[in-house]
From Swiss-Prot:
Annotated protein name in UniProt: Undecaprenyl-diphosphatase
Note: Bacitracin is thought to be involved in the inhibition of peptidoglycan synthesis by sequestering undecaprenyl diphosphate, thereby reducing the pool of lipid carrier available.
Chief place of localization: membrane
Record-annotated membrane-spanning stretches: 3-23, 45-65, 88-108, 115-135, 150-170, 191-211, 225-245, 255-275
Single GO MF annotation: undecaprenyl-diphosphatase activity
Organism: Psychrobacter arcticus (strain DSM 17307 / VKM B-2377 / 273-4)
Catalytic activity: di-trans,octa-cis-undecaprenyl diphosphate + H2O = di-trans,octa-cis-undecaprenyl phosphate + phosphate + H(+)
Protein family: Belongs to the UppP family.
């Protein structure tokens, strides 16, 4: 058994857990980390990057189980404890998920073939950072204080923003949080709605990718590496979710804008100056 490989899986799980729900592109950081460590083969890294996100999204389900269960019951029965509009959150999440499902299933292969490039990733990191600065410096009147207050029209618009996350370097969390802030959703509600919106998208993508490409996992050690990364991402994401909600309840997202821009500039320098190409 390759101990170094298992340690690398732990590091990759930590990277995923920290970055998944921050508006900074977790996929970009995972691929950069894999490249720096020489982690696994290209085909296995591609699968790992998608499936390890399942651990992070399980942290959301675990931490918000009561609210998610109430939202599901509200959607199915029209009754939910503590909700004035029981079906609102469930319907809003469904509406917000539809655009990315349509665009993703239609153009996913083309996007990966033509846009999976370090220059594209760097540019989208920088643009995303600038957009965070823009929405933070031009706050809109708050129309939704909690995730349960997000209306169907607002949810659809957030869902359209989520489609931008199909472009490498954009960040699903970044696109949905920026979109929500732009539309007048509070910082806390923007973050939590983004958490919830990731459940169908990430679970669906992880299961689909695992079913399609499970043949690249050729040994029990491969499955162990994937399992370790997923478990570690769950534990780390659980902590980071709570820290992020506490952070945005008191502060803004500008620190993440700076992080995106700095990372984007470094990737541009690596690509233009040293011919860096992303392994994914």
């Amino acid at each position: 058994m390759d101990i170094i490989l298992l340690i690398q899986a732990v590091i990759m799980g930590i990277v995923e857990g920290i970055t998944e729900f921050l508006p900074i592109s977790s996929t970009g950081y995972l691929i950069l980390s894999a490249d720096l460590m020489g982690f696994w083969t290209k085909e296995k890294v591609d699968l790992f990057v998608v499936v390890v996100q399942f651990g992070a999204i399980l942290a959301v389900i675990y931490d918000y189980w009561d609210r998610l269960w109430q939202a599901l019951m509200g959607l199915l029965t029209g009754k939910a404890e503590g909700m004035s509009n029981p079906r609102q959150l469930g319907l809003s999440l469904i509406v917000a998920t539809i655009p990315v499902m349509i665009v993703g299933f239609t153009f996913a292969d083309e996007i990966k073939a033509y846009l999976f490039d370090p220059i594209v990733v760097a540019i989208m990191l920088i643009i995303g950072g600038l957009l965070i600065f823009y929405v933070e410096n031009r706050p809109k009147p708050i129309i939704a204080q909690e995730a349960e207050d997000v209306g169907l029209k607002t949810a659809l618009m957030i869902g359209l923003f989520q489609c931008l996350a199909l472009i490498p370097g954009t960040s699903r969390s970044g696109a949905t949080i920026v979109g929500a802030l732009w539309l007048g959703v509070s910082r806390k509600a923007s973050a939590e709605f983004s958490f919830f919106l990731g459940i169908p998208v990430i679970v669906g993508a992880a299961l689909l990718d695992l079913l399609k490409h499970k043949d690249v996992l050729t040994s029990s050690e491969d499955w162990l590496v994937l399992g370790i990364g997923t478990v570690v991402s769950f534990i780390v994401a659980l902590l980071c979710i709570r820290l992020l909600v506490a952070w945005v309840s008191r502060r803004d997202f500008k620190i993440f804008a700076w992080l995106r821009i700095i990372t984007g500039v470094l990737v541009l320098i690596a690509a233009w100056g040293f011919g860096y190409q992303m392994a994914g």
